[in-house]
Amino acid sequence: MLEGVIRESITKANAKALKKDGYLIANVYGKGIENVNCAFKLNPFIKYLKEKKHLIFPVKLGDKTFEVVVQEYQKNPVTNELIHVDLLAVTKGVKSKFKVPVKHQGTPVGLKNKGILMLSKKRISVECAPEHLPDHYLVDVAPLDVNESILVRDLEKHENVKILDHDSIAVIGVIKAK
């Protein structure tokens, strides 16, 4: 479980001091809970996120434990280092909006015909209760030829999950190389 510290002071000086000590500034919020300003050690946080299997994961702040999902993050445009992360605390049975990653498998036929695989949409916006949240959308790209794509409407439908993106948006496709 990922452990963080609750920030007593939310001043700019305090944030700079925490960043200098190797902390990532974060905010935990959700329906029915009070916002919690906190900080996590940067490297263990990144390592934990890369190794986790599900979108929802537990964090411990002080004596409280929250089930959270990464809602938004900010990176330094020059160094590409994480600066800030917003964590949405989820409650069982309460619908929320999430962004579910798209993963692809297979090698498209179009790559042999001088095509390039283009991932147009890395995340799909959905609305559902946390217990119905899919970990990812898996797309088989093997049958795709040049100038073919998979749209949002072609994705696997999950029960009790409403896709918020327009159904005619391309998710992944093969385009012709110039």
Curated annotation (Swiss-Prot):
Annotated InterPro entries: Rbsml_bL25/Gln-tRNA_synth_N, Ribosomal_bL25/Gln-tRNA_synth, Ribosomal_bL25_b-dom, Ribosomal_bL25_C, Ribosomal_bL25_long, Ribosomal_L25_dom, Ribosomal_uL5_bac-type
Keywords: Ribonucleoprotein, Ribosomal protein, RNA-binding, rRNA-binding
One GO-annotated biological process of the protein: translation
Xref: SUPFAM superfamilies: Ribosomal protein L25-like
Source taxon at top rank: Bacteria
Keyword Transmembrane: no
Gene Ontology, cellular component aspect: cytosolic large ribosomal subunit
Family designation: Belongs to the bacterial ribosomal protein bL25 family. CTC subfamily.
Subunit structure: Part of the 50S ribosomal subunit; part of the 5S rRNA/L5/L18/L25 subcomplex. Contacts the 5S rRNA. Binds to the 5S rRNA independently of L5 and L18.
This protein's name: Large ribosomal subunit protein bL25
